[in-house]
C-alpha cells in the first residue's frame, strides 16, 4: 500500500484513510519512489526540504531531552510532497490547485453529512449557579487556566465534566457531520481569507482575522478592577463588625470614635487592595511566561508565535510534544496522534486522518482540538476556531456554571484552621470579659461619663478584630505570590502556588543528567572506526581511535586526527594553524583524516562514517551569531556534536564564518525518504533515516557490491545506543586498495563484537556519551517492503532484520557533555540541607557513573556497584519489558541507589512512588512528552523551560528558565526562606494578638482600667503591626536555612517548638510588660492602680431627673496625684478640680498642693493661692458646702429636667477631671509600651540567635519600625489626633519608662526562651551523633 497517499487517491481507491503511514492534503505530488520532485522551493519558503515523520523527537542516546524545533519546522513541512501513487509535482501552487483533490473528496458528501444541527439550550432548572469565592481563592488561582479548570473537573467531578461535554456536544457537535469536519477545504480556507495553502495567511489578513475573531485566549475570570477589589475588602466578617461598631458610635453621637474607625478601616482596605493587586499582577506575569508558543506558516515562512496570536485561517505546524493551539482541520498527517483525554476522558491516543473515520462519533478524527497534546508524528492544521469558540473553551464555560471549588494551598487551609481556633477561643474569652465587666459595673476612668456598656463592647470589638487572625491566609497568599515572582529572578518560574511552600520540604531531587546536571552542549571528541584489514588500526586489530581537534564547542572548523598522535606538541601546533585560519595546513602538522583531499583508504572510511552521522542528524543545523561570533547548534544537542564532527570531515552546509574549504552538503546527494523515518524515543534508544543513493551500490566511498549482483539503491542509517544497536549488527567493512567495502562474505564474530563493546565501555568510563553508527543497504524491493509496514516500530524491526541481523557497523562516536558550573557545589549544599540527589539518565551505566563522580554525586567512599543501577534491574528478571519488582524490593533498591541509568519514563514513576512511600517529598525533572506522568506523580514536577515540551511544562509545578540543576537548589532555598519568613510573621502576629487578649483579661480580672482603648487596639493591629509584618516577609535567608533537614510535609506552620519557645513566652512577657507599664503609669499619674480607688478620687452628687424619675451622678470635686520630675521639684503633687464660686464653673488646678494629700480641704496648708482666694468668701446661695472638704457642691434636693442639664455647683457631663487625666496618661504609657513590645518583637522573632547578630541584615525592618514608632509618637503629641485616640503628651521620663518596658520585653524574649531553645537543639544534635556512632563503627 502507498505509504504517502494523496487524499484524492484515497477517495477514488476507497481506501481506509487511517491505513497510510502519512496522509497529506497535497499541494503537489512527487515521484513515487520518494525522491525529490521537480518543483523548487524559494529560499526561506516553507518546504525547503522534506523531513521524517516525528523527526522532532529525540535523537538516539539522548536522555529524554527534546530538541528545539524552530528551524526544524522550516524543513519539515515541504510543499513538494511525495506521492506513492505516481505523478510529479510542480512546486508551490495556488489554493485552487493545491487542495483540489481534497475538495473533490469532500464536495459530494458535504450536503449529506451536514444536516441542520439541532442546537439544545439549557432548560430551566438545568443551569448552574455561580459560586462566590473569597479573596484568597481569587488570588491563589488567578493564574489557573481554563484548561486546568477542565482537567480538575474531569478528575474531581466526573459527573459535572460529563454533563458539560454532553451539553457542549449538543450545541456545538464535533462529529464528522460538523461543518468544519466536512466542508471542502477550499471553502473553509476561503471563509478565513486563506488564498494559498503553501504560504499561509498574509500579515494583513492576520490583522483582519484578529480584529474579526479576537485573540486566541481561553478567558479566565476577568481581572477585577481596583474599585471592586477595594469594596470587597469591606465584606469580611471582621471588617463588617468594625463598620457596625462605627455606625453604633455615630448613632450614640460618639463622632470621634465613629469617624476614626471609618478612617482606619479605609486605610487598611486601601493597603490590602494595593497588596492584592500587586500579587495578582505578579501571578499574571508568571502565567504569561509559561504561555506556550506554536509554529505557523505566514507569507511563506515558518515562524514561532505565541499561541495567543494564532487566528482562524492560520496554517499551524504540529509536532510531538506540542500543545494544540486552537481547533483546526487536519490538512496533513504524518503518523499524527493526539491525546484528547482532556476533552473525552479517554487516555488512548487518537490517530489523525484527513477524513473522519466515523461521521456520527464526536471529536472527528480529521479535527485537532485546542489544549490537546500531540503525542506522535507531525502534521499541519487549518485553524477554524480560537479562544472561547474552541471546544475546550465551550466545555469550560459549561463547567464554570457549576462553580469553582476552593484552590487554597495546604498552608492556607492550615492557617484557616489555626485562625478559626484562635478566633473562637478569643471570642469566648471576650464574651466572658464583657459579661464580667458589665456585672461588676466597669466604668472607664478616662471617660467617666461615657456609657459603660458601649465602652466595654467597643473595646471588645477592637480586641476581637486584633485577636482573630483572619487576614493571615491572605497575607500568606500574597507572600507566596510575591515569593514566586522573586523566584523568577533566580530562573525558576513557579506555576502553582502550593509548590512554593512544598519546595521548603523537598527531601529528594530526582534530576535528569543531560542539560540539567550537565550543560547539554555535546562536543564530539572521539571517533572509533571498525574495519577489517585496516592499515591503521589499534592494538585489537579491528578498531581505530581518532580525535576531533580543536574542540571549541560548536565551532565546526578543525580536523580529525589519529588519537594517539594528538600529544600536547601536536595540539599546540594545530592550534597555531587554527588561529591563523590555515586549515588546509593541518596535514603539515598531522595527517587529517577529515580532509577530502587525502585519498587514502582510512580517510575514505573516516569520512564515510561521518557522512552517515551527518545524514542521520538532518534535523540539526549550525549557525553563527553575528553579534557574539559564537557558534550555535539549532536542534538536538546530541546531534549537534555529530554535525560539528561531520563538518570537520567537510560535510555540512556552508555557513558564514566556516572558513574551511571543500565543504559539501551531502543531503542533496542522498535525498531522505521522509515517510520511512523512525524517530528516536526513550524506549527504542535509536533512530533511522532512509536515503536514496546517488550511485547504485555506493554509500560515500564504501562499495556495497556483493557476489550475487544485488543492486542497492537506498540505505537505512541507524544511529543509537551501542548496547541496543550492537545486538542487530551482522557485518562490517573491509579496507581495500581502492577504499572500504562491505565484507558480505564474513559476518562479525562474537569476539569482534566484544572488542567493540570494550571500546564502548572505555569511552563510557571517560564520561563520554557514545553513539553507534550503522547502516543497511536497501534494494527497491526492500524500500517497497518498508512502505508496507504499518508504523515506525514495524519499519525499524524490518530494517534491523526480521529473521537475522542486517546492520553494517561503521563505528562509534564519543561526545563529552561537561558538568554545569556550580553543580558540584549545589549537590554539596543539598547534602548539608538533608536533601538527597538522585540522577536518572538514559545513558549507559558506565557513562552515568563517570558523570556522577565528576559532579560529586558519587564520592570516593561510595561503591558504584551499590550506588548505581541499570533500570532493567528494577524489573522482574532484569527485563525492562516485564513488570516492576514488588514494592518491598523496589523500596530497598531505591533507598540506596543514587544513579539510575537506561531509565524509561515508567521507571521514573516507579522511583517517585517508592520515594513517596518512604515518606519523602520528591522533586522530579523532565522535558519530554513521556515525562509528564512522572512530573504529575512527583510532589514537585520540574520542567525544562528551554528543552521542555509544552506537555512537560503543563504537567509541572515549576519551570526552570535555564534548565539548570543549580536553579532547583536555589528554588528550594528560596522556598525554605519564604516558608521561614511566613513562620516568623505568623509567630509575630499570633504572639502579639494573643498577648493583647491576655493583658485585657488580666486587667479586667484585676479591676484595673483597660490597657488600651478601642481605637488604640485598631491602630496597633491594623496600622502599627502591619509595617513590621511586611518587613518580616522580606527577610533574607538565615545562615542555617540550608543546613537543617527538610521539614515534614504535614508539619504545622506553628510547631511545638514555636509555641513553647516563641509564642507562649512572648505573650506572657508582653502581657506582663504592658500591665506593668499600665500599673506603674497609673500609679505615677494618679497615685492609685485599681478602678475603685480611682473612681473614689472624685466626689459625686446625685440629682433626680424629673422626666424619667431616675438618679444622675454629677462630679463637684476631684483630687488626684502625680509624681513629677522637674528641674525645680521631684516628688508627689496633688491636682484638684473644684467648683469656683467666683466664676461659677468647674475649674482644674494642677499641682494645687505639694505632696500627696488624699484628704485635702480648703484649709489644708500649702493649698494653691488661687484656690484659697476663690474659696475665701465661701459658697454662694443656691449651693451647699461639703462638710468634709469645705468645697462647694449642688444644693440638696436639686432636680434636673434632662441628663444634659448641669446643676449649679457641679461639673458638666463632658468635663475632663484630674482623675481622668491621670488615667489617660497611664493608658498612654501602656499604649506606647504595647507598640514598642510588638515592634521590638519583630526584631527578636527573626532568628533563634541573638537578635543583634542579624540586626542590620534587613533595612526594610528599620524602615518599618521607624514608621510604627513615628506614627505612635504623632498620636500622642499632635492635637486633634490625641483626642481621637484618647492619648496625651507625656513627660519625658514617662516616655522613657514606657519605651523601657518594651525593651524589658525584648530582653526577656532574648534571655529566656532563646537559650532554652538552643540548648534543646544542641542536646538533640548530640543525641543524633551518639545514635550514629555505633552504626559508623559497625
UniProtKB/Swiss-Prot annotation:
Its main location: membrane. Residues 1-106 are annotated as: Disordered. Changing residue 419 to S: Reduces sensitivity of the protein to inhibition by cipargamin and (+)-SJ733. This is P-type sodium-transporting ATPase4. It holds the Pfam family Cation_ATPase. Inhibited by cipargamin, a synthetic spiroindolone. Inhibited by pyrazoleamide PA21A050, structurally unrelated to the spiroindolones. Inhibited by (+)-SJ733, a dihydroisoquinolone compound. It comes from Toxoplasma gondii (strain ATCC 50861 / VEG). It comes from the Eukaryota. The keyword Cell inner membrane does not apply. Sodium-exporting ATPase. Required for the extrusion of Na(+) from the parasites to maintain a low cytosolic concentration of Na(+). Required for maintaining the viability of extracellular parasites but not for intracellular growth, egress or invasion. Involved in parasite virulence. InterPro entries: ATPase_P-typ_cation-transptr_C (IPR006068), ATPase_P-typ_cation-transptr_N (IPR004014), ATPase_P-typ_cyto_dom_N (IPR023299), ATPase_P-typ_P_site (IPR018303), ATPase_P-typ_TM_dom_sf (IPR023298), ATPase_P-typ_transduc_dom_A_sf (IPR008250), Cation_transp_ATPase_P-type (IPR050510), HAD-like_sf (IPR036412). Keywords: ATP-binding, Cell membrane, Hydrolase, Ion transport, Membrane, Nucleotide-binding, Sodium, Sodium transport, Translocase, Transmembrane, Transmembrane helix, Transport. Residues 55-69 have a biased composition (Basic and acidic residues). The keyword Transferase does not apply. GO terms for molecular function: ATP binding; ATP hydrolysis activity; P-type sodium:potassium-exchanging transporter activity. Residues 91-104 have a biased composition (Polar residues). It catalyses: Na(+)(in) + ATP + H2O = Na(+)(out) + ADP + phosphate + H(+). SUPFAM superfamilies: Calcium ATPase, transduction domain A, Calcium ATPase, transmembrane domain M, HAD-like, Metal cation-transporting ATPase, ATP-binding domain N. It is an enzyme of class 7 (translocase). GO terms for cellular component: plasma membrane. It is found in: Cell membrane. One of its GO terms (biological process) is intracellular sodium ion homeostasis. The chain crosses the membrane at residues 229-249, 255-275, 418-438, 456-476, 985-1005, 1068-1088, 1261-1281, 1288-1308. Belongs to the cation transport ATPase (P-type) (TC 3.A.3) family. The gene is ATP4.
